[in-house]
């Protein structure tokens, strides 16, 4: 496969493709060094291919929105999907650093732009394209299910931070302050802002599957349960799948937890 580097100086209609031999297609779609994504395409004919192309899963990594965590976390999943005939679009985005004071808008903008870039790629069936996110990436996936102009075929949220206010009060993350560092403020006195970015306050406009390990100590499964209950109260049904593993087995391609997720993806194709 090859890397295709998109020049940020060109319009979307006039993309210049520079081919560089690498294991995956790395696409730099913006001017910032984090505005890129890796495209994994099946090497063999896909059993899921139609005239429009192959279905694709956009992957959003976790790490409590911190810059030090990268898309490498989702690379094994991307490789596994491609081996099974499903394209993967593994994205990077703006994460917060210790000196930052709120980057949530940049993060969401990057994710939305990456989703938009996917529609420009040849060989992709954009109608059957999905979004899958883990942990903080699960939060972003749920937000995309609510705000994305082009709705995903399916949204899978793996151990998602589905209620950022509850996550902040529970001091989730190593330092306990990751949510408010990403937001740039505390929830008290900024309720409307936090509601804008909180999945539990923004019902999805597409089908959602919640995948959560009952042994998860990093993001408790009650995050998914509370979200599902809140959506039901709003008249929105989401699917819940409780898994036996923890926060990391859910992204371990050698685990039974991952096999369950692959079966769900296949069921939608």
Show where each model-derived region lies.
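C-terminal catalytic histidine-bearing segment of alpha/beta-hydrolase fold enzymes
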Residues: 101, 225-269
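Mobile cap/lid helix-loop segments that gate and shape the active-site cleft of serine hydrolases
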Residues: 166-200
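Conserved alpha/beta-hydrolase "acid-adjacent" motif
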Residues: 217-223
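Primarily recognizes the serine-hydrolase "nucleophile elbow" in alpha/beta-hydrolase
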Residues: 113-172
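N-terminal cap/lid segment of alpha/beta-hydrolase-fold proteins
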Residues: 2-49
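Short, surface-exposed "cap/lid" segments of acyl-processing enzymes
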Residues: 46-52, 57-80
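Catalytic nucleophile-loop/oxyanion-hole region of alpha/beta-hydrolase
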Residues: 68-78, 89-127
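Short beta-strand/loop motif that positions the catalytic acidic residue
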Residues: 210-212, 216
């Amino acid at each position: 496969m090859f890397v295709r580097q998109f020049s940020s100086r060109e319009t979307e209609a006039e993309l210049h493709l520079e081919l560089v031999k690498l294991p995956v297609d790395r696409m730099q779609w913006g001017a910032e060094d984090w505005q890129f994504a890796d495209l994994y395409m099946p090497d063999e004919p896909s059993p899921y291919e139609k005239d429009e192309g192959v279905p694709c899963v956009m992957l959003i990594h976790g790490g409590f929105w911190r810059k030090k965590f990268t898309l490498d976390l989702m690379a094994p999943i991307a490789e596994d999907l491609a081996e099974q005939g499903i394209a993967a679009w593994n994205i990077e985005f703006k994460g917060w650093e210790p000196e930052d004071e709120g980057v949530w808008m940049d993060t969401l903008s990057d994710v939305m732009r990456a989703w938009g870039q996917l529609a420009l790629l040849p060989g992709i069936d954009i109608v059957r394209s999905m979004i899958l996110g883990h942990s903080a990436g699960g939060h972003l996936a749920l937000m995309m299910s609510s705000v994305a102009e082009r709705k995903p075929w399916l949204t899978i949220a793996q151990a998602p931070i589905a209620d950022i206010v509850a996550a902040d009060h529970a001091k989730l993350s190593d330092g306990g302050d990751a949510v408010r560092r990403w937001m740039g403020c505390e929830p008290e006195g900024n309720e409307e802002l936090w509601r804008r970015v909180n999945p539990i306050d923004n019902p999805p406009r597409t089908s959602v599957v919640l995948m959560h390990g009952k042994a998860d100590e990093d993001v408790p499964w009650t995050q998914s349960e509370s979200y599902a209950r809140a959506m039901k109260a709003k008249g929105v049904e989401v699917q819940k799948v409780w898994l036996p593993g923890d926060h990391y087995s859910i992204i371990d391609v050698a685990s039974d937890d991952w096999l369950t997720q692959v079966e769900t993806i296949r069921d939608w194709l």
